[in-house]
Amino acid sequence: MKYRKIMTAIASMTMAGVMLVGCSSNSTSSTGSTDSGSAAGNSTASSGGSESTAGSEKVSLTVWGPQEDQELIKKMCNEFAAANPEKTYSFTYGVVSEADAQKEVNKDISAAADVFAFASDQTAILVNAGALYRVTKNKDKIVAENSEASISAASINGELYGYPYVSDTYFMYYDKSKLTEDDVKSIEGIMSKNIDGVTTNFAFDTDNGWYQAGFFFGAGCKLFGDDGTDPTKCDFNNERGYMVGEYLIDLVANPKFGANFDDSLVKSGFADGTLAAAVSGVWNAGEIQKSLGDNYAATKLPEFKLSNGETVQMGSMANFKIMGVNAETKNPLDAMALAEWLTNKDNQKTRFEARSYAPTNVELASDTATMNSNIAVGALAQQAKYSTVQTSIGQCQNFWTPAEAFGQEIIAGTCTKSNLQDKLNAYVEAVLATLS
């Protein structure tokens, strides 16, 4: 799905710094070396042994992933080659974010990477395009080792088409020198504070559908029905959706609210001390922690009060990072083996330690002490119970633009309480419109 600003950030999914394939590539040959490869655009060959001991069968694989994961991917690929010395593996790396994977792969499936990372909302689109190779190697093991929700997100009609490895949603970072644990329990508590040096008490990307949906979910609204698979249902324009609209209009009008904070504004606000709390994800954990130092804190999203007096917990949209194998790869068994390696327990732990990515591996995720030792991942875990898994049905393509337009109209002041119902009706009508 989206991540409109985030995944083109995470998740965020992240996700910032997105580049397209072609901007950077790197080739490495390896039969056991842990050489991470050369600079972009160059090729290096490393043999790990003499020709007489090198694998006799040569296998070339192209791997795509986001810019921020390139060094990790290269390290993991070289370790895969070292663990499989019976073959000589060469790797070509391309920079493609999870958010852009579907777009780039579907330009020309035959020219796309053998193995690539994608966001779980793209599963159905990629399968329908014939772009994903069905997992036939070690399927039962992969299913058993990863969370049920992540496996469901990587499956279509009971068939597994990918290897989940990161669980993702958003939560709230805050500066604990400016806000207390009690303050951050509710938006009202945050916004009621007068804080020296702070111009923005609470920041949120209002015109970003991935975030915006959290308010509607918190009020009990549903996007594409109870399980997210009915393309004829969206009730954001019902009575409870109307109360969400009212709340957003009032919130955006508050001068202490940052209504259109993308990743760069969130990070700069914490860095210069003008921001007290913001909604974001694990992809920004490192920079925010560096800025806040001992005052670094994170928690689940806050509660908010509807116009009928009811207090509700803000929801969120969750998805997963998945590694897929190209349906047209010339080396399906090797590509599946590599995808499984890149997403195994050890490498999920590596990502957790290096990037603060929350694992889908059941054993790792159930290690509460370890997960909570990372403040951002601990906050993500708190919010997960209030999250709605991002659907991968094709109709979801219709969600992002009207969500953005609705948010922009609230920010611009053209969506008011007097025309709110009409704006919500138009929003839902656009979401449910027949796909072109």
What are the roles of these predicted feature ranges?
Residues 106-107, 111-114, 142-176, 200-205, ...:
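A structural signal for short loop-to-beta-strand junctions that line the ligand-binding cleft
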Residues 230-260:
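Glycine-centered hinge/linker elements that transmit conformational signals in sensory
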Residues 161-165, 170, 188-234, 275:
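Extracytoplasmic/periplasmic solute-binding protein
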Residues 42, 120-171, 182, 297-301, ...:
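Hinge/lid segment of periplasmic solute-binding proteins
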Residues 368, 381-436:
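Conserved C-terminal helix/tail region of periplasmic/extracytoplasmic solute-binding proteins
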Residues 18-22:
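C-terminal motif of bacterial Sec signal peptides marking the signal peptidase cleavage site
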Residues 290-354:
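Extracytoplasmic/periplasmic substrate-recognition and gating elements
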Residues 8-9, 23-122, 305, 311, ...:
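Conserved N-terminal structural module of periplasmic/extracytoplasmic solute-binding proteins
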